[in-house]
Amino acid sequence: MKANAGEVYTVYNQYLKRYTACQVAYIAPPDTVSKESWAVVLSLDWVGDAPLTAEELPHLRPLYKDFMYWSRDLHLLRVPLEVPPQYTLVGTLPPFTDQPCRSYGGWSDGYDVYLQIRWQAAPEKRRRAFKEAMESDGETEIGGIPVKVSNHRVMDQYAPFDSALELKALPCLSELICQRWHPDLLEFLRGNPFISELTLLNHGQRTLDLRGTSIRKLMLDMTGLEELWLCEGTEQLLFQNKGLDACTIHAPEDGSGLTLQFIGEYCPHTELPNLRGLHGIELKDFDLTGLAAVHPHLKELRLWGAPGNLQNFSAVGAFRELTNLSTFDLFGFGADDIPTPEQMPELRWF
């Protein structure tokens, strides 16, 4: 089905686990990027537990993208005219905009809309303070070290704070790198909706509960850690030490939204049967036997060698839901080990 100007579509957003909507604002002519016309798609400010209905069309408004460090603007994207099957046509409205669009891509998977809706859920006072801090030329002190109020990243190695609560002086902080444990770190993280990236090394903890935080990307030293609880929105967990861990990882929906990255060796995490993605780096010898039984719903498998060898590569054929598969600097397999399209019906990128 080809898109037409004014058409409104609804689609399930895998990140929000709810339905969202968009409008084809206009059809753009061919340009230097493509000889084909483009559909310019506008995200709409609507979220629902069920698909959008025609009765709701008159109440729709455009979605403005201004989350985190983005300047406020309509969320527009040039996409191919062919509408993906997961998008359902609801009806037609007069186009909301004819604003020029210079961003290109495929029909959105909804990630930017998810981040915008998540941003709008934060208290308005906090969002306003974030934007003001972004533009500020002022300074404050963290651990006795002068730091710009506009800083979005702090490393305790260079700003050696004792109490993590000192970081409240940085309203647009979004990334924290800790080389040691801070007793009130969890209190600070649970009170800040904008800390999305955390690196935690040499923490000395046996258990770590990050529920109630907003961390999307976690770089974690697994040494000595026995039990880990991830928050609702954690998308990436990157181990920071080589070798096998001995940790039980608790993730929402048994890891359905989580990608895990290990270094060198992997201890199969049977408690994550729904794990979405698995990345391995610095591999010397890695055996794929039995991995699909541990993570049967894996969507992405990416492996990097040191360089190294892969054993039993043909075992990837057991990942029936895999969409993305890649290996780099890894050897030990041949053409006969490559799975057939029938074995991996969902594979889109290899």
Identify the function of each model-found stretch.
Residues 18-21, 98, 132:
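Conserved beta-strand residues within beta-sheet cores
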Residues 126-145:
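Extended, compositionally biased accessory segments flanking or bridging domains
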